[in-house]
């Protein structure tokens, strides 16, 4: 009976951990992707306020399972006239990137009409932004 309750408690705790959607701390793993022959499963542990980066990749000894863990990028404060972000407008997608955080009272816009600089290469437009 004790084992049954221990199992139920363990399962419930895991579900709470995977569904909490709390903001990530700097050292937290945000999510992991586990790929097997059956497909890919994603376990989300917390929500990043920034973009993520691949932190580690592990492969099981039998080469049947690969686990990739992701953390949140650390965004530093912007210095004077530094590019705070960019928007790459491509035919198939738009990619918004953040490079640093603006000081209180300033904002890093994310629409082309507020771009500090715009360049076109092929069928892609690159817009960059500074804090205003």
Swiss-Prot record:
Residues 1-19 form the signal peptide. The keyword Disulfide bond applies. Keywords: Disulfide bond, Secreted, Signal, Toxin. Expressed by the venom gland. Transmembrane segments: none annotated. GO terms for molecular function: toxin activity. Contains 5 disulfide bonds. Its main location: secreted. One of its GO terms (cellular component) is extracellular region. It is found in: Secreted. Belongs to the scoloptoxin-11 family. This is U-scoloptoxin(11)-Sa1a. It comes from Scolopendra alternans.
